């Protein structure tokens, strides 16, 4: 029947767009400058330094704190930790699944359905019926 076709699956397109967006956001965050602006429109000393002109003098030293952390490595550790937690959660969830084989005890052990595997487990001999 025309008109009863399944809808187009855009899952792969959304995955590619999400990966591209995350890649662009990651590159932007890693390359953006978050240091305070020091100097004027002509002279910039973002990493510290000295500048002396006829009427002005600028001394700016490298910003530091008692707890020096590199935020790039902090973000990397957060991403790796979250990835590890998600992976562990999926592995634990897969281990908790209950899988069972249903065997019809009312049918003959020869298998009355097409395929001949009704009442048998693949790779094993026939199971006794009660």
UniProtKB/Swiss-Prot annotation:
Keywords: Host endoplasmic reticulum, Host membrane, Membrane, Transmembrane, Transmembrane helix, Transport, Viral movement protein. Its main location: host cell. One of its GO terms (biological process) is transport of virus in host, cell to cell. Residues 110-130 are annotated as: Disordered. The chain crosses the membrane at residues 13-30, 73-90. Residues 1-12, 91-130 are cytoplasmic. Residues 31-72 are lumenal. GO terms for cellular component: host cell endoplasmic reticulum membrane; membrane. Pfam families: Plant_vir_prot (PF01307). It comes from the Viruses. It is found in: Host endoplasmic reticulum membrane. Disulfide bonds: none annotated. TGBp1, TGBp2 and TGBp3 seem to act together for cell-to-cell propagation. TGBp1 is the main movement protein that physically cross the plasmodesma with the viral genome. TGBp2 and TGBp3 would facilitate TGBp1 function. Plays a role in viral cell-to-cell propagation, by facilitating genome transport to neighboring plant cells through plasmosdesmata,. Belongs to the Tymovirales TGBp2 protein family. This is Movement protein TGB2.
């Amino acid at each position: 029947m025309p008109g009863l076709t399944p809808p187009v699956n855009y899952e792969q397109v959304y995955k590619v767009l999400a990966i591209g967006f995350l890649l662009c956001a990651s590159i932007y965050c890693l390359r953006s400058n978050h240091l305070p602006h020091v100097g004027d429109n002509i002279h910039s000393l973002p990493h510290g330094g000295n500048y002396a002109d006829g009427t002005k003098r600028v001394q700016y030293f490298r910003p530091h704190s008692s707890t020096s952390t590199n935020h790039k490595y902090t973000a990397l550790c957060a991403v790796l930790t979250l990835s590890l937690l998600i992976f562990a959660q999926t592995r634990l969830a897969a281990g908790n699944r209950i899988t069972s084989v249903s065997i019809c005890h009312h049918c003959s052990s020869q298998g009355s359905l097409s395929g001949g595997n009704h009442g048998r487990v693949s790779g094993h001999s026939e199971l006794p019926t009660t």
